[in-house]
Design a protein with these regions (language model features):
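Carbohydrate-associated surface elements
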Residues: 42, 166, 187
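Conserved donor-binding/catalytic core segment of Leloir-type glycosyltransferases
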Residues: 161, 204-220, 226-229, 240
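Acidic anion/phosphate-binding donor-loop and adjacent secondary structure
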Residues: 172, 187-201, 206, 385
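Aromatic "clamp/platform" in nucleotide-sugar-dependent glycosyltransferases that forms part
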Residues: 290
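Short hydrophobic beta-strand element within catalytic cores of glycosyltransferases
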Residues: 307-310
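Conserved acidic donor-binding segment of nucleotide-sugar-dependent glycosyltransferases
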Residues: 322-323, 327-334, 343-348
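A short, well-ordered alpha-helix in the C-terminal region of glycosyltransferases
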Residues: 336, 343, 350-364, 373-376
Length: 407
């Protein structure tokens, strides 16, 4: 058994896919017999400590968090001292075998600091926006100070996991990362949910229903979806936008300007079973992001049998197949996006064919296989750390056999 302290400033119900994925990985590791504690952000009404599905979750206070979906700069900065202080208290009273941080900033700063203070090996999982986001002024590619901080976190970690080859390449090429990086794609925990009819969900029966899901930020390019739909004159469609974030008001205004207000529903943040009920009631999933580190939401949509329309930029291109799982379009190519939407909307047979394919294809991305690779990599890192320290101390014999891990 390994004792793992996982740090992620965003953990459900906070954040987006990166938080959900870290929860699924942590839960799968506990199901394999390991002990996982989670250090994350406290927000309105959430308890400072609780047990969730076998995980002990510790939440630390931050300043300036505005909503569930999106962290402010000040909330991210304040997570570091709060996280280090809470982690210090935990590590003084309990022996952990390994630290695993998700996102280079701010979680990785916390993890690297605790690793140095206590001599415990640190594995950093890099996600996407922490490495590359061309739409944000405050991102490693657009801010030299942040680039320096992220580079230092990368090169101070004992091992890195990238959620896609795309993110690995960007860390090595753009940020000069010298630490070993293994690629471990996200997986999916097949959700259990009771399907509901469109009538129960308040969705018209006689329209082709498109759904976009994610934080409402520029990088998700939901603006392009609205622009594409404005070109589909006379087509009976409805767009459900699930999520919240700083772009919501601008998107609402754009929908009105384009004459789409009556055909676009802003659903707000939807979680758990309800999220999958809306996905299962839709016909097409569309999210042409400027960039995705991986895109867990695409797996969720495919599990519900939806054809997926995405962009050609990011880690999603490592598993989405143009013409097989749906369509891939260049970033910002509104006309091409409108064409692919129309093609799927007008061809029920094609939608059914892709739906059946996706429901089977997504089974390859099982979370248990992801957890097995994390387990093997963690065990290998712990062994290397103990050899370096000349310590084969208590608990070393309990580590899983093996320790090999591919990329």
């Amino acid at each position: 058994m390994m004792r793992i302290l996982m740090t992620n400033y965003e953990f459900p119900p906070l954040g987006g896919g990166g938080g959900v994925a870290s929860y699924q990985i942590a839960k799968a590791l506990t199901e394999r017999g390991h002990e996982v504690d989670v250090l994350t952000t406290r927000w309105r009404g959430l308890p400072s400590e609780e047990v969730v599905d076998g995980l002990r979750v510790y939440r630390v206070p931050v300043v300036g968090r505005g909503d569930l979906a999106t962290a402010s700069l000040i909330s991210m900065l304040s997570f570091v001292p709060s996280g280090v202080a809470e982690g210090y208290r935990k590590l003084r009273n309990k022996r952990y075998d390994i630290l695993n941080s998700h996102f280079a900033v701010p979680s990785g700063v916390t993890g690297v600091t605790l690793s140095r203070l206590f001599g415990i090996p640190h594995v950093l999982t890099i996600i996407g926006g922490d490495i590359y986001d061309p739409t944000r002024r405050l991102s490693p590619g657009n801010n030299s100070l942040l680039r320096s901080v992220v580079r230092r976190v990368l090169n101070s970690s004992g091992q890195i996991i990238a959620i896609s080859q795309d993110i690995k390449n960007r860390a090595q090429q753009d940020l000069q990362c010298k630490t070993n990086i293994d690629v471990i794609h996200y997986g999916l925990t097949p959700p259990e949910f009771e399907r509901r009819s469109r009538q129960e969900l308040g969705i018209p029966e006689d329209e082709v229903v498109l759904i976009s899901m994610g934080r409402l930020i520029k990088r998700k390019a939901i603006r392009d979806v609205l622009l594409a739909l404005s070109r589909l004159e006379g087509s009976p469609f409805r767009l459900l936008i699930i999520g919240e974030g700083p772009e919501e008001e601008r998107l609402r205004d754009l929908a009105k300007t384009l004459g789409l207000a009556s055909r676009v529903d802003f659903m707000g943040a939807v979680w758990g079973e309800s999220k999958f009920q809306y996905l299962a009631a839709a016909d097409i999933f569309v999210l042409p992001s400027v960039h995705e580190g991986f895109g867990l939401v695409f797996l969720e949509a495919m599990h519900c049998g939806l054809p997926v329309i995405a962009s050609t930029s990011g880690g999603q291109t490592e598993f989405l197949q143009d013409g097989e799982t749906g369509f891939l379009v260049p970033v910002g190519a509104v006309e091409a996006l409108a064409d692919r939407i129309l093609r799927l909307a007008n061809d029920g047979r094609l939608r059914k064919q892709i739906s059946e394919y996706n429901a089977q294809y997504v089974k390859r991305f099982d979370i248990s296989a992801v957890a097995e690779r994390y387990e093997a990599l963690f065990a290998d890192v712990i062994r290397r750390s103990r050899r370096t320290a000349g310590d084969t101390g208590p608990g070393s014999s309990a580590l899983p056999a093996g320790g090999t891990h591919g990329s």
